[in-house]
């Protein structure tokens, strides 16, 4: 099957490259040509000219309806000239064409001499009356002017409707992954492209991205809905339009410096009373970028190159080195990239790009970690992205393209020096991680170390036939990749303490989490992810309809390999596991745009699209028997030495038995609840479930209020299908009422917030001892819906000034009430009954030139805290109960038995979490952030120098970013673990030539 499919893909690639061409998912100029009587004019030569085009001009001829369409235009300033024998030439000048925008330019031609030219200079249209795709574009002026962290995510948080899992203040989070989401789609459903070529990473099903040097971008577009058949996923579709160099030597140097001495403090007395000794902060941020472009051969071969050094050293809240100094997460990135653009002939163009990124991180840690021992050190992580694309304009109507791109990310997360100990030695047993679950913190060691090596390769080709009224596209994309890992840990476990009762960290031993380490090199393979699409966009008077179909094949597998024995697992050898998954699905797309008044100023848009869930190797990883597995077991520190003692013996056939009797000398770990197949099989079985998909529809109206100012109102709804559920077949009950499951017995606990009784279910000892046989399968009763309402505006104010922003109201509701294997999951399972509010956000950003060469820019955003971001996994507020020891608080409302033990010592499992507040109904605090920037431009001939002053979080918001615990019984419940970066002041400069 795989060989046959690859043959089909190769044939499709060849056919597409040899067939008529494609629009490169960039911009277009379209319109209708008429004479002064209103009659349409066929045969008019329409020429678009711009310095942004290496070939200088692109021309087409209007069709029998007087319509024309010029596609695959780079963003830039254009002039459009209309010529026909017997008529005066007509020219529209100074048209600023943004990325991913279809600009309508109509022409009325007068009878006269061809040598006569009527030139009209006016404001470019701001409403796209041809496409239903919702697009927001940041041009180079906005990228340089608006204060951000200069990452694709940091810039993305300016876009209405886009949410980040963590806010980025002044680039303080630019060294680590932050994740964008929109319209209820997971972060893996984002598509990241350079010049229309996919450069997503492979890790986390494509959610993890490289660290792109923003100097390479001419513009960056963010599309969030109405995406056509040329793209698989329905999340944020991000396209970086590259700088190409040009016919004139040009370059720039940008620098920024933000030291901790210039940062304020937002650590309030309330946080200090909670035990937060220090807030978040920066040690320093340093950013220096050099870029140079120009011609190697004028009009034939251009180059662009850039080098960047970017360092962010963050203070970690409530973390100190042994000498008393604040804990610092020290890290830097070095980037070197180059791009070549070659106009091979009048019809063919080749572009190629390579970016090498090296990343270092000295102390990967969180609040209350012991920096010298518990931090993770990233050794020589290396990221490589590249891309090459050949495009051909065979005739004004026939265009082709084909290319290759890849994303390789290799990194090692290791213990700090001298923490790793030789396996099996006394030090190895003694130097395990200690985790304080109630009060927060790690010490003695990290929980483990690992290497990760994801690699993703992409080939794609496409073609289109373009007339004035039609744009027929067809194309194919083929991706493959591998993801290899290793994992190891001192002691093959970490120790968990819950010390809320004493208030003294690491004083109450609770449990151990054992691991199936060591894991030698193991991995998963994306055999193929293939998509073939066909789409036609056609215009009938004021109506433009786009219909398309996309068909996709996706196949992954687990690689076969071996690993040696560990403390809790025998030596293991597993064969490859194939077809996890093996999917083939259609994804139809439909949209319509109506030019309401025929003046290109008001557009009514509708879209109805199916988006398949993005996957790479995530499913294969879930069924890899070598996946990193953990199991929580009860631990009693009998001798009080802080070292968890005990192990397992293995027979020749791989079966096991405890090496000693629990609660005797040297035997402190209770293995009675350890599943029989721990570490020797994947805990989950693949149920061959179908691919999850989302049916999204949107209605939007866009109107140009006055020249250069447009407003947009929109509504979007998503309905997710083929959602899955994990069922442990050992505890499965087929009866109608899961509360009658014979593997469970009911017992009553009390809500510590209200005193109301709650029925929970104890697993029988016989059921608890059964092996874990998790089956992942489709759940026909599980539902997820998403609704959003947006109001946006965008203003081009002249002289480079711009302002954009708006409101977004969004809500996601989940119904997940299938409880055939565990009736405890019925609690808080239906969001339609959980009073989930709409999450609200407002954003505004822009830049404005002032007299004397001064430019003012800034952004303001207010949004729900991280736990209120739709489309992300949020945390339920719960009671964490350990059997036989956890007690009701003294102030528990009646009829709650205050002070009593909540669960008996015989309860199974050993710990139980009882949700009291639904995750989607809980918000931490609103994040309100105001960032401003002032710069002064000094011009010296062709050289300009602009010193700048930046201030981030001017309002000095102290909103919580994370909490110590969501366990309502903990004394640290909802206490701040980290807070917003306080007010941050920085200086910088831009030198351009």
What are these regions (language model features)?
Residues 2-6, 10, 15-139:
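Periplasm-facing N-terminal accessory domains of Gram-negative outer-membrane beta-barrel systems
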Residues 165, 559-587, 591-777, 890, ...:
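Solvent-exposed loop/turn elements at secondary-structure boundaries
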Residues 667-672, 759, 853-942, 946, ...:
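Extracytoplasmic gating/loop element in the C-terminal half of outer-membrane beta-barrel translocons
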Residues 63, 87-244, 263, 270-277, ...:
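Periplasmic N-terminal accessory/gating domains of Gram-negative outer-membrane beta-barrel systems
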Residues 922-924, 959-993:
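C-terminal beta-signal and terminal closure region of outer-membrane beta-barrel proteins
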Residues 554, 704, 708, 712-870:
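Gram-negative outer-membrane beta-barrel transporters
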Residues 250, 280-360, 378-406, 588:
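Transmembrane beta-barrel wall of Gram-negative outer-membrane proteins
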């Amino acid at each position: 099957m795989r060989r046959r499919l690859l043959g089909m893909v190769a044939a499709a690639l060849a056919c597409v490259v040899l067939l008529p061409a494609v629009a490169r998912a960039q911009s277009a100029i379209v319109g209708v040509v008429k004479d002064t009587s209103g009659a349409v004019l066929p045969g008019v030569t329409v020429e678009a000219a711009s310095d942004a085009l290496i070939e200088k001009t692109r021309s087409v001829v209007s069709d029998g309806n007087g319509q024309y369409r010029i596609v695959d235009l780079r963003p830039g300033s254009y002039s459009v000239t209309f010529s026909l024998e017997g008529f005066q030439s007509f020219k529209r000048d100074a048209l600023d064409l943004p990325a991913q925008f279809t600009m309508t330019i109509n022409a009325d031609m007068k009878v006269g001499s061809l040598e006569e030219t009527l030139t009209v200079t006016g404001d470019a249209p701001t409403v796209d009356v041809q496409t239903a795709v919702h697009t927001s574009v940041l041009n180079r002026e906005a990228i340089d002017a608006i204060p951000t962290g200069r990452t694709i995510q940091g810039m993305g948080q300016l876009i209405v409707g886009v949410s980040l899992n963590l806010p980025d203040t002044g680039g303080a989070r630019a060294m680590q992954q932050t994740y964008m989401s929109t319209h209820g789609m997971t972060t893996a459903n984002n598509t990241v492209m350079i010049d229309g070529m996919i450069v997503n990473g492979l890790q986390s099903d494509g959610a993890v991205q490289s660290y792109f040097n923003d100097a390479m971008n001419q513009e960056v577009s963010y599309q969030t809905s109405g995406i056509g058949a040329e793209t698989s996923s329905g999340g944020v579709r991000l396209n970086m339009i590259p700088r190409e160099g040009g016919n004139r030597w040009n370059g720039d140097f940008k620098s920024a410096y933000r030291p901790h001495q210039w940062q304020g403090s937002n650590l309030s007395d309330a946080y200090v009373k909670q035990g937060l000794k220090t807030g978040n902060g920066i040690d320093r941020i340093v950013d220096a970028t050099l870029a140079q472009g120009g011609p190697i051969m004028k009009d034939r071969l251009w180059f662009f190159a850039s080098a960047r050094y970017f360092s962010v050293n963050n203070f970690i809240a409530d973390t100190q080195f042994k000498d008393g100094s604040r804990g610092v997460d020290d890290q830097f990135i070095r980037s070197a990239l180059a791009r070549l653009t070659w106009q091979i002939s009048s019809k063919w163009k080749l572009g190629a790009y390579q970016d090498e990124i090296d990343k270092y991180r000295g102390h990967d840690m969180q609040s209350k970690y012991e920096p010298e021992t518990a931090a993770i050190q990233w050794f020589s992580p290396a990221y490589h992205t590249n891309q090459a694309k050949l495009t051909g304009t065979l005739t004004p109507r026939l265009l082709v393209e084909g290319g290759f791109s890849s994303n390789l990310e290799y990194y090692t997360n290791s213990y700090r020096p001298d923490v790793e100990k030789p396996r099996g030695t006394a030090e190895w047993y003694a130097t395990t991680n200690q985790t304080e679950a109630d009060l927060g913190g790690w010490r003695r060691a990290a929980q483990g170390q690992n290497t990760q090596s994801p690699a993703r390769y992409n080939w794609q080709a496409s073609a289109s036939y373009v007339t004035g009224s039609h744009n027929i596209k067809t194309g194919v994309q083929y991706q493959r990749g591998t993801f290899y890992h290793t994992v190891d840990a001192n002691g093959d476990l970490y120790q968990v303490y819950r010390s809320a009762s004493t208030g003294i960290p690491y004083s109450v031993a609770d449990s151990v989490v054992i691991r199936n380490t060591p894991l030698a090199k193991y991995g998963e393979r994306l055999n193929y992810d293939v998509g073939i699409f066909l789409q036609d966009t056609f215009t009938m008077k004021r109506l433009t309809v786009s219909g398309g179909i996309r068909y996709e094949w996706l196949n992954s597998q687990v690689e076969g390999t071996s690993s040696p024995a560990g403390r809790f697992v025998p030596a293991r050898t597993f064969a490859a596991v194939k077809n996890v998954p093996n999917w083939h699905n259609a994804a139809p797309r439909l949209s319509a745009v109506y030019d309401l008044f025929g003046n290109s100023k008001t557009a009514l848009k509708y879209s109805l699209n199916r988006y398949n869930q993005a996957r790479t190797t995530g499913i294969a990883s879930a069924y890899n028997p070598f996946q990193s597995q953990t199991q929580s077991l009860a631990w009693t520190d009998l001798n009080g030495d802080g070292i968890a003692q005990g192990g397992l013996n293995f027979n020749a056939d791989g079966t096991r038995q405890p090496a000693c009797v629990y609660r005797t000398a040297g035997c402190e770990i209770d293995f009675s609840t350890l599943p029989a197949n721990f570490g020797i099989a994947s805990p989950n079985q693949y149920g061959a479930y179908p691919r999850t998909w989302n049916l999204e529809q949107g209605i939007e109206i866009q109107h140009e209020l006055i020249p250069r100012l447009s407003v947009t109102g929109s509504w979007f709804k998503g309905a997710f299908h083929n959602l899955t559920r994990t069922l442990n077949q050992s505890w499965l009950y087929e009866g109608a009422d899961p509360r009658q499951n014979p593997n469970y017995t009911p017992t009553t606990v009390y809500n510590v917030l209200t005193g109301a009784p709650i029925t929970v279910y104890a697993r029988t000892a016989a059921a608890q001892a059964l092996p874990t046989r998790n089956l992942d399968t489709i759940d026909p009763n599980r539902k997820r819906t998403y609704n959003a309402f947006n109001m946006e505006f965008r203003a081009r104010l002249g002289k480079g000034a711009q302002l954009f922003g708006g409101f977004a109201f969004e809500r996601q509701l989940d119904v997940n009430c299938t409880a055939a294997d565990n009736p405890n999951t019925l609690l808080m399972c239906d969001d339609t009954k959980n009073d989930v509010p709409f999450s609200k956000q407002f954003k505004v950003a822009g830049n404005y030139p002032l007299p004397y060469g001064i430019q003012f820019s800034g952004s303001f955003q207010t949004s729900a805290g991280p736990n209120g971001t739709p489309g992300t996994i949020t945390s339920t507020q719960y009671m964490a109960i350990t059997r036989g020891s956890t007690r009701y608080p003294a102030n528990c409302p009646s009829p709650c038995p205050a002070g009593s033990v909540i669960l008996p010592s015989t309860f199974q499992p050993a710990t139980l979490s009882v949700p009291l507040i639904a995750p989607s109904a809980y918000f931490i605090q609103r994040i309100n952030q105001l960032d401003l920037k002032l710069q002064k431009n000094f011009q010296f001939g062709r050289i300009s120098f602009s010193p700048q002053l930046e201030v981030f979080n001017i309002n000095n918001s102290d909103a919580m970013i994370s909490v110590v615990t969501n366990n309502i019984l903990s004394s640290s419940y909802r206490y701040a673990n980290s807070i917003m970066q306080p007010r941050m002041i920085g200086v910088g400069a831009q030198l351009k030539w």
